Amino acid sequence: MIQEKHLTFTINLLVSLFFLTILIIPKGYNYAPIILSAIGLIYFIPLKKKLSFSSEDKKLIFSFLFYFFTFLLSIIINKDGIREIDNPSRLLLFIPLLLLFKNFPIKRKTILYAIPSSALITGCVALFQKFALGYEKPFPETMHIQMGNIAISLATFSIVITLHFFIKKQYKSTLFGFVAIILAIMTSALSGARGGWIGLPVVVGIILFLYKEFINKKLIITLIAIITIGLTALITSPKFGIEKRYNAAKSDIVSYLEKNNRNTSLGARFDMWENALIAIKEAPIFGHGSDGYDEFRHKQVKSKQMAKTTLNFGSLHNQYLESWVKRGLVGFIALILIILTPIFYFIKNLNTHNLETKCICILGIIHIVSHIFYFTSQSFLAHNSGNIFYFSAMLCFIV
């Protein structure tokens, strides 16, 4: 029989590896969660360990199951293929993962050091791939928008943890955290993705607000100044191409608003979103399903109500519209549930004098808030990388 101390060590090691390998190894986001889920299944089912559920656990499990159920419902009502549940079926693996973490809590230090270490290593590898190996974008195995968003998450997580280190007067760790923040932001900049940056000022503002009782105005001004100077340096550096992408986005928006040009990157997305509202009106409750939506957009393109360029997109690039168009109001409610249920949990547990617990809860809040923004410009959960990152990281922060 495996001793519990060995199991605890293994769980913490795998959690560390989840963050450390999430981008630097192709499909690295898969391996640790799958192994952890398998451990959870083995521990609770064959070994017949007693299961105990708190009311918060039950709410979280219900939100997971309901979200998965909407995909099953779409298969039945909209006659989607069975392939549609391949991605969301991973949610079922997160239930034993939740129970495993509840019975074998992750050590706070595992989270506090694994995340900035991941940000630092990921940044170094990204810079090496871009400037030494000549890659167009780092980590080409991962879709660049997904990669850019995950890198921004590593950066914002590192901001939270760095402030924690500063409050605890662990100044060497604080310096380590600052380096991690810079490298994670650089990774996102190199990805070429723009959507993840939209919510960054709001997320940083929330972090500072939640830590306001521990940090003075002088520190807040210093932090904002450092972040502003750093971002300005990144934006103005042609090597990172941020200014070029900003100007391209600005041009796309102006072209769409003034000339109704739907053939640019952003113009096609705006066109998809406009037509998504029409699709929602046609099937508001249960949606069109994936196949039904494909038929809808081909019909719209044929009638010239939708640009042909939109057919090049595999998703709506908006998680909220994607859920409602394909799975109706039922699917949209399920999406809102998997956002609100965990964030209320983290907010409820935020009021504590334990600085480590507070830090982990803030990480949880920031994780959810960041994804609220990611979902506006990307169908983040439609990709395995986004699906696994969102739920796995969320469960790692459950205290």
Curated annotation (Swiss-Prot):
Cysteine disulfide links: none
Compartments (UniProt record): Cell membrane
Keywords (A to Z) from UniProt: Cell membrane, Membrane, Transmembrane, Transmembrane helix
UniProt topology in membrane: Multi-pass membrane protein
Transmembrane segments: 6-26, 27-47, 60-80, 111-131, 147-167, 173-193, 195-215, 220-240, 328-348, 362-382
Domain of life: Bacteria
Major place of residence: membrane
GO CC terms of this entry: plasma membrane
The name this protein goes by in its record: Uncharacterized protein HI_0874
Organism name: Haemophilus influenzae (strain ATCC 51907 / DSM 11121 / KW20 / Rd)
